[in-house]
């Protein structure tokens, strides 16, 4: 919706998002973000709230952002994570840094950097910018035989792009390129008519066998398949469009910054 609005200026997007966020304000805390997935990924909600706030200036949106943060899984712990699911980590580690934009609390910004480095110190013996979590990261499974979901690849790219916008730190641009050019192309066919659920750096076969427990998830997840792994089928297409979108960014002095590979 946000991308569509920036293309079309369709007022219905603003109206719909405003009404949705007004509804969220009415949801009691004990009913908000209850589910495992939504509780992990509340940071995406905050990103959209800030986007709308920057277009409308509606004060209630900042109150809602505080409410969402309060009810989202805690990604600020120094030595552990709320869960070890690869897509959650790639998508959610930036939640504290996102909320930092409202609070100015530098500890929140540092927390996102910490999660990024923590997962790679522990499970990062995997080239291509990612970490070993073929569904979930597991102690003892840390070498290049381990893989990561296609969803995890594109969510990591998106998070790197968002972190770049929030911090101006070129590390995030470099890391996004590392994933985009060294991991993502191996996960999809050039014509995007098939993808694999799990991609490993030391990936010598593309068969339909179950490789559990070496691979955490049970199933035929090393094969290129146009029909399985619906989550990745719905998610993978954001990779290159968002990458291209973030090649041109605004600067604080009302200029533009062109990023080249």
Cite the ranges covered by each PLM segment.
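Glycan-recognition and catalytic cores of secretory/periplasmic carbohydrate-active enzymes
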Residues: 1-259
């Amino acid at each position: 919706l946000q991308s569509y609005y920036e293309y079309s200026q369709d007022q219905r997007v603003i109206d719909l998002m405003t009404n949705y966020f007004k509804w969220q304000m009415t949801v009691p805390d004990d009913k908000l973000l209850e589910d495992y997935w939504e509780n992990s990924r509340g940071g995406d909600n905050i990103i959209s709230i800030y986007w709308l706030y920057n277009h409308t200036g509606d004060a209630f949106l900042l109150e809602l952002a505080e409410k969402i943060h309060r009810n989202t899984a805690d990604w600020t712990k120094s030595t552990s994570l709320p869960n070890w699911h690869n897509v959650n980590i790639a998508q959610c580690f930036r939640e504290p840094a996102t909320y930092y934009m409202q609070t100015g609390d530098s500890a929140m910004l540092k927390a996102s950097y910490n999660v990024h480095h923590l997962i790679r110190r522990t499970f990062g013996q995997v080239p291509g910018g990612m970490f070993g979590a073929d569904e979930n990261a597991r102690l003892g499974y840390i070498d290049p035989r381990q893989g990561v979901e296609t969803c995890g690849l594109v969510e990591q790219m998106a998070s790197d792009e968002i972190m770049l916008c929030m911090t101006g730190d070129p590390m995030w641009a470099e890391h996004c390129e590392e994933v985009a050019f060294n991991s993502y192309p191996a996960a999809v066919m050039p014509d995007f008519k098939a993808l694999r659920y799990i991609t490993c750096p030391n990936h010598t076969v593309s068969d339909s066998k179950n490789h559990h427990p070496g691979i955490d998830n049970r199933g035929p997840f090393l094969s290129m398949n146009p029909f399985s792994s619906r989550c990745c089928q719905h998610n993978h297409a954001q990779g290159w469009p968002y990458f291209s979108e973030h090649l041109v960014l605004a600067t604080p002095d009302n200029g533009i910054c062109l990023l080249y590979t």
